[in-house]
Amino acid sequence: MDNVEDLRGTLLSAVAEAGDLDALDAIRVSALGKKGQITGLMKTLGAMDPEARKAAGQALNLVKDEIAAALDARKADLAAAALEAKLARERLDVSLAPAPEATGAIHPISQTWEEVVAIFAQMGFEVAEGPEIEDDFHNFTALNFPPGHPARAMHDTFFLPTREDGSRHLLRTHTSPVQIRTMMGRKPPIRILAPGRTYRCDSDMTHTPMFHQFEGLVIDKATHFGHLKGCLHEFVRAYFEVDDLPMRFRPSFFPFTEPSAEVDIGCSRKGGALKIGAGDSWLEILGCGMVHPNVLTACGLDPEEYQGFAFGMGLERIAMLKYGIPDLRTFFESDLRWLRHYGFAALDLPTLHGGLSR
């Protein structure tokens, strides 16, 4: 037992020099394991006389406890050092600029919708809505479409299956049924804007089976074509943000208006680039006219007492013209790159005072 102190010193030095937890565990096994050095000395106590066994046992227990305490302390130090190294590797530099946040963008159709509503709201119009699945009366008959009109054909309109009573519904081909429902449901004066989705059997670079349209309707006792011209002058100049935008009305025909007109705005096509404003070219943007007496009668209004005007245009079309979007189909492709390029800030709401399309 004379070498207990030497063993103690050797083991304490080895514990202090252990560079990692694996080395420390190897020292624990060699000292305190079943075949460890201290364990081996403890097994020799049985061959000693009682007095010597008592003294040697006390000495070995002290060394055993001291080595165990040293192992625990060194293990705690190594664990703390490992944690410190890990934290140093994962340290964040709070002075660095943060990564840019991924933000959404307002779709050009939604932006154009809000711009149009903002302009007409300043003129006293209110937004009216109606169902997208309509019946023949509201979509055609009440709007003075004759029975053989091409719009009633299967190749131009999406019809739903025929019902048991022989009637069949359809996807509305315009938002004009909203006008019909409004005139039948309330008394004049009426001043509404009817934006929404419409459906027609058509698909190419400038047509899609579903598109957005907005229509306006004014009904009162003294409404005339001059009011229509003034209203549309205000709109096109505010929307395209061109104060002196040239504008002309060409005679046309629509079943639901009489007289009817198509509206052109001035533009320039020099160098192959379209520029809205002064120029030697004209660009058609909408249709309009005075509400046909037959339409007023179908809605229960006396055409001798009330007159009105209506107008309509495609949201995609005027968005393409204002924002230089070449292909109508890209509006519906859900391409995030396209939306980042043509989209608008979510909180930048259009107003006439603050600006429509900042």
Swiss-Prot record:
Residue positions binding Mg(2+): E258
EC number per UniProt: 6.1.1.20
GO biological process, one term: phenylalanyl-tRNA aminoacylation
SUPFAM superfamilies linked to this entry: Class II aaRS and biotin synthetases, tRNA-binding arm
UniProt cross-references to PANTHER family, sorted A to Z: PHENYLALANINE--TRNA LIGASE, MITOCHONDRIAL, PHENYLALANYL-TRNA SYNTHETASE
Family: Belongs to the class-II aminoacyl-tRNA synthetase family. Phe-tRNA synthetase alpha subunit type 1 subfamily.
Subunit structure: Tetramer of two alpha and two beta subunits.
Name the record gives this protein: Phenylalanine--tRNA ligase alpha subunit
Organism: Rhodospirillum rubrum (strain ATCC 11170 / ATH 1.1.1 / DSM 467 / LMG 4362 / NCIMB 8255 / S1)
